[in-house]
Amino acid sequence: MASIPFASRYRMIDFLLSSMVGCGIDKIEVLVRENYHSLVDHLGGGREWDLSRKNGGLSIFPPFAQKSIGSMGGGRVEALANILPVLKKQKEKYVIMADTNIAANFDFNALIAQHVKTDADITFAYTKRNCHRN
């Protein structure tokens, strides 16, 4: 989903990266599954988002660097389980997992503030919708 073009020049991941950088997040790791070459070309070194730096910045976590290649199709929770050893070595206090399937700007500062305020172990951001079945 991240590499799907939007308005010819952009990709879906651009919304997420711009929102994160706009909120002061300066270390972003992108987990990729398959057919990610065009995404890597698009992201480059992260310069477009001021993420080209020695400390922090943008890094791409390809499937061959993840624990079990065959199980990456399972979803977000399984992806988190696959990279848990890497996450445990991080110095950051909080981890945000976000998908690239929505074209919107998101205020991650409000999410983090609510997370800290409630002293939660996990915080989810979602939109409640009424689904009507015909």
Where are these regions (language model features)?
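Unchanged
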Residues: 1-134
